[in-house]
């Protein structure tokens, strides 16, 4: 039985939760407010979920996302809001930084595959909000990748929908979808959500349509 997208509580820009990042949260909230960005984040966020950030069209997405994470100051440790990266990112001079902000390497050559690796990680963690860009690239593609959906289904966790809205200078993470197993219906609901909020990435022409390959 499919649950429809449920709008969630909007959190004011820069609102902090106690004991998360301390002064860093305050500084990041001030910085985002200073440059005119607003942040709307689901509250409470599910303990375990796949967080989709769309569209991913620019290198600026990472910086804006990172400042959002710090500014909002949700009550979880940095490793509980995480993202996956190719193994090479965690071997060079930036390895420590990527780990510090919640990144972890994924073995793309593993016989088990990406989805089983992530499902296993979800099962092992008491708290895990896994952030993923559904396109998997900043370049235009005629589809989004299905990995975010398959991970959510395999791990039995909801999908939290987030958007980078560069023209209006806002980050919106304010809807939750429980996968029904009917991929076409769920993708249509996701596409409708993004059309409704009218988000545009840094380069809107590079945003992928909500279809799987």
Language model features with spans:
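Charged, glycine-interspersed solvent-exposed loop segments at helix/strand-loop junctions
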Residues: 199-213
């Amino acid at each position: 039985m499919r649950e429809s997208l449920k709008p969630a509580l909007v959190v004011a820009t820069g609102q902090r939760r106690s004991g998360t990042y301390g002064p860093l949260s305050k500084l990041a909230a001030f910085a985002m407010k200073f440059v005119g960005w607003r942040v709307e984040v689901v509250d409470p966020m599910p303990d375990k979920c796949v967080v989709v950030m769309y569209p991913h069209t620019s290198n600026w997405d990472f910086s804006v996302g990172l400042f959002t994470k710090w500014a909002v100051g949700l009550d979880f440790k940095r490793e509980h809001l995480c993202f996956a990266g190719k193994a090479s990112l965690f071997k060079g001079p930036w390895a420590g930084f990527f780990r510090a902000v919640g990144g972890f390497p994924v073995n793309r050559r593993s016989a088990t595959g990406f989805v089983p690796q992530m499902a296993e990680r979800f099962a092992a963690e008491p708290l895990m909000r896994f952030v993923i860009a559904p396109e998997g690239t900043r370049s235009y593609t005629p589809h989004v990748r299905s990995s975010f959906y398959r991970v959510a289904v395999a791990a039995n966790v909801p999908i939290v929908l987030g958007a980078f809205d560069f023209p209006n200078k806002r980050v919106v993470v304010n809807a939750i979808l429980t996968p029904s197993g009917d991929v076409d219906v769920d993708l249509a609901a996701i596409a409708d959500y993004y059309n409704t909020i009218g988000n545009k990435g840094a380069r809107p022409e590079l945003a992928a349509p909500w279809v799987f390959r």
